[in-house]
Amino acid sequence: MNSGQLAEQHARTYLEQQGLTFVDANVRYPFGEIDLIMRQQDVWVFVEVKFRSSNQFGGALNALTSKQITRIRLAAEHYLQRQKLNPPCRFDVIAMNIDEINWLQGCF
């Protein structure tokens, strides 16, 4: 496993410990990708996992671009349409460094 895959696994475990239910991972379309799909009761949570080994250049919290946000939103819309679902949903970010994890809920 590479560091990105390990970070996604760690993020999944962390979110499950917080009471979320795992739905899917690494959902890819030509126009975007979703790292994790979780559920928190009736809310579907699309999670982008960002890992940085240091805080140099702003660390994990500053690693998400507006282009990536657009691509994640498109992928989530497509996923829900393919599943014929229309649930309440939100977009979270798990920002991880070597020594900490930050869970930002509903951040875009």
UniProtKB/Swiss-Prot annotation:
One Gene Ontology molecular-function label: nucleic acid binding
Pfam families noted in UniProt: UPF0102
Family under the similarity heading: Belongs to the UPF0102 family.
PANTHER family: UPF0102 PROTEIN YRAN
Matches recorded under HAMAP family: UPF0102
Protein name: UPF0102 protein Sfri_0388
Organism: Shewanella frigidimarina (strain NCIMB 400)
